[in-house]
């Protein structure tokens, strides 16, 4: 686990993280078989750790450096990846108009591009059948963001309290969830619906068949993919007021009672495809 270089003194945090990661990798290379590759999901700073932040010293055994991303607007991470990545893995629905020229630059530098047919959720989740019977009142999981992330500070839209009227709410707000945040996806299918400012949680909930209302200005290629594939995702990207907002909320509330009518595209074999990209053998 590494500290995210955000907020005050983020440059110092980044250098400290780079140095500690390099020292860790150097120690690992001294014990047993040297490390030959690094796989970074979104956190491209670790890809720099194959070389020292202060010296010209490099860990030459680390010849394969993979950068995996599904977030086109994470331009800072993309720019760091261009400095060290040898391979980039992005989804087939990647929207190049949002990535700041990242893929074009990666191709120009000779970085190998792999395109995954599916979302990240297709890799670590399993398709399930959502219960048709809705609780009374409906049980809805709500996740609100702090909005201080690298790329989400201008994406957050305030959700009025009236939105939750008549619902039994499970609060899972960022940094305030009482349970294990890494196991939050297991709670999604246990609820009748999800209301969230988080695009990641929205995608996971929709993939599991839970009707989801995403309230965010975020633009991601996978949001269009989910809607095109028939998943129960309702997106709202403006202020929560007016008749259009009331209609969208009504569509979501009605959607919780219509899960038996959901028809989605077949679940892609993204997990095996990713394993092939990484030259890994799955054990289950």
Where are the regions a protein language model picked out?
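Short, well-ordered alpha-helix to beta-strand connector turns
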Residues: 35, 62, 84-86, 110, ...
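Catalytic binding pocket for nucleotide-activated donors in carbohydrate/polymer assembly enzymes
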Residues: 207-260
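A nucleotide-sugar donor-handling region in carbohydrate enzymes
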Residues: 87-154
């Amino acid at each position: 686990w590494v500290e995210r270089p955000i907020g005050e003194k983020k440059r110092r945090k980044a250098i400290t993280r780079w140095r500690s990661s390099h020292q860790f990798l150097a120690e690992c290379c001294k014990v047993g078989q040297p490390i030959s590759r690094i796989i970074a999901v979104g956190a491209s700073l670790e890809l720099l750790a194959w070389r020292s932040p202060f010296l010209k010293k490099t860990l030459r055994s680390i010849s394969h450096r993979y950068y995996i991303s599904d977030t086109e607007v994470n331009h800072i991470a993309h720019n760091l990846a261009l400095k060290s990545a040898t391979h980039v893995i992005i989804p087939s629905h990647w929207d190049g108009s949002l990535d700041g020229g990242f893929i074009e630059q990666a191709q120009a530098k000779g970085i190998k591009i792999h395109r995954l047919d599916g979302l990240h959720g297709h890799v670590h989740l399993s398709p399930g059948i959502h219960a048709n019977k809705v609780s009374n009142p409906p049980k809805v999981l709500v996740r609100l963001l702090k909005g201080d992330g690298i790329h989400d500070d201008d994406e957050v839209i305030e959700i009025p309290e009236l939105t939750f009227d008549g619902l039994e709410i499970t609060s899972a707000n960022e940094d305030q969830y009482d349970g294990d945040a890494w196991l939050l996806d297991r709670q999604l299918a246990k609820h009748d619906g999800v209301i969230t400012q988080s695009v990641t949680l929205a995608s996971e909930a929709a993939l599991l068949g839970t009707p989801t209302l995403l309230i965010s200005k975020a633009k991601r290629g996978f949001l269009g993919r989910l809607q095109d594939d028939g998943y129960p995702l309702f997106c709202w990207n403006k202020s929560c007021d007016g008749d259009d907002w009331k209609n969208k909320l009504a569509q979501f509330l009605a959607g919780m009672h219509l899960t038996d009518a959901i028809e989605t595209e077949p679940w892609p074999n993204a997990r095996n495809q990713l394993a092939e990209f990484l030259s890994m053998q799955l054990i289950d």
